[in-house]
From Swiss-Prot:
The keyword Amino-acid biosynthesis applies. This is Gamma-glutamyl phosphate reductase. Keywords: Amino-acid biosynthesis, Cytoplasm, NADP, Oxidoreductase, Proline biosynthesis. Its main location: cytoplasm. It comes from Methylorubrum populi (strain ATCC BAA-705 / NCIMB 13946 / BJ001). It catalyses: L-glutamate 5-semialdehyde + phosphate + NADP(+) = L-glutamyl 5-phosphate + NADPH + H(+). The lineage of its organism: Bacteria, Pseudomonadati, Pseudomonadota, Alphaproteobacteria, Hyphomicrobiales. PROSITE patterns: PROA. It is an enzyme of class 1 (oxidoreductase).
Length: 432
């Protein structure tokens, strides 16, 4: 199976430094061309990529089965296996996500602001591509297509480094993307998959490849993200943990609370938007706590709770302090009764990860306070935490979720993969 850049020859390179430096230089050159690519050409390429992914489904699934088998033999967790596994529906969803990106408005060249100075200068702020985006991911093979498509749409070049778990699948998807690029005449190096499993390649990407990489996006476990944040010499869009809360406040409808809670926790337990902690307001604990805990247990979710939660069902096991700061990524949730909105917000501030947190209530004033005061990238009112997703936000797809405060926050889609420049129009003005 060829790597994404079929003509590069990088797969035969003996010297990793030379290999990665070459990838960086080629990406930088491709990025300059991509920044000027017409919107129509980019969209044609994306649609061709989606078509080729569908045509290559059998190959992608065959390679994915090999990856899954190897991961199972290596004793990987159920959560990792779930993120790694593709089926016909998931491959179709990957292609559809690429098409959705194609249908989005072009984020490049938009006038973000315009104003005139007293001296007659006309100043515009215009959106432009970031340049070269490095994406380092582990067990999510769909990131290959999502990241490549988003970078392409935003006029960037992408360097993709797949983890060992998903390398075969990523290579198969990458080959399909290469075909789409070739059909439309865009640079073959606009999207490159690093053709090695050598982990030292990650370290080289984090240096910026001699000024060729403008931003790094890690998609993977805590150890990967910690390493990237600690070692990167370029800006990073990332989140460390997804410790998401569902707070059942006073005024919550029990039926809605049950439905939203179960979706937040159990729809997919291994994603970063899955709820990890249930907070129930003391004002509704008598009516809501027991049925909510029973619903979780009956759905196959283990519950670790405080004394009040343990008291409603003998199957609840004690929670310790570490549980409030644990991203389980499994069918496990911690649960606690809190004394009012202030206590809920304080608990989230002390133990959360600034990712996604939800309040369930019909009290609009309480909801407004929660949405305003909880310092997370995404806060929801009467909606599942699992809406923390670029596709659900209408972004077509996402390259990741960012919880930092610089530039991108929340789902990172095409708009977040641009920056801006100022265009200054004069008529001969000079500065006194």
């Amino acid at each position: 199976m060829p790597v994404l850049n079929l003509k590069s020859g990088f797969a035969d390179a003996d010297d990793l430094d030379t290999l990665m430096a070459g990838i960086g230089r080629r990406a930088r050159a491709a990025g300059r061309a991509m920044a000027l690519a017409p919107a129509q050409t980019k969209d044609l390429a994306l649609r061709a990529i989606a078509e080729q992914i569908r045509a290559s489904a059998a190959t992608i699934l065959r390679e994915n089965a090999r990856d899954v088998s190897a991961a199972q033999a290596a004793g990987q967790t159920k959560a990792i296996i779930d993120r790694l596994t593709l089926d016909e529906g998931r491959v179709a969803a990957i292609a559809e996500a690429v098409e959705k990106v194609a249908s989005l408005p072009d984020p490049v060249g938009r006038q973000l602001a315009a104003f005139e100075r007293p001296n007659g200068l006309l100043i515009e702020r215009i959106s432009v591509p970031l340049g070269v985006v490095g994406v380092i991911f582990e067990s999510r093979p769909n990131v290959t297509a999502d990241a490549g498509a988003l970078c392409l749409k935003a006029g960037n070049a992408a360097i993709l480094r797949a983890g060992s778990d998903s390398h075969r699948t990523a290579t198969a998807i990458a080959a399909a993307m290469s075909e789409g690029l070739a059909r439309t005449g865009l640079p073959a190096d606009a999207i490159q998959l690093v053709p090695t499993r050598d982990r030292a390649a990650v370290g080289l990407m984090l240096t910026g490849l001699g000024g060729c990489v403008d931003v790094i996006v890690p998609r993977g476990g805590r150890s990967l993200v910690e390493r990237v944040q600690a070692e990167a010499k370029v800006p990073v869009f990332a989140h460390l943990d997804g410790i998401c809360h569902v707070y059942i406040a006073e005024g919550a409808d029990l039926g809605m609370a049950r439905t939203v809670l179960l979706n937040s926790k159990m729809r997919r337990t291994g994603i970063c938007g899955a709820a990890e902690t249930l907070l129930v307001d003391a004002a509704v604990a008598k009516t809501h706590l027991k049925p909510l805990v029973e619903a979780l247990l009956e759905s196959g979710c283990a519950v670790r709770g405080d004394a009040a939660t343990q008291g409603v069902d003998p199957r609840v096991t004690p929670a310790d302090e570490a549980d409030w700061r644990t991203e389980y990524l499994d069918a496990i949730i911690s649960a606690k009764v809190v004394d009012g909105l202030d206590a809920a917000i304080a608990h989230i501030e002390a133990n959360g990860s600034h990712h996604t947190d939800a309040i369930i209530t019909d009290d609009t004033e309480a909801a407004a306070r929660f949405l305003n005061e909880v310092d997370s990238a995404i806060v929801t009112h009467n909606a599942s935490t699992q809406f923390a997703d670029g596709g659900e936000f209408g972004f077509g797809a996402e390259i990741g979720i960012a919880t930092g405060r610089m530039h991108a926050r929340g789902p990172v889609g095409v708009e977040q993969l641009t920056t801006f420049k100022y265009r200054v129009h004069g008529s001969g003005q000079t500065r006194p």
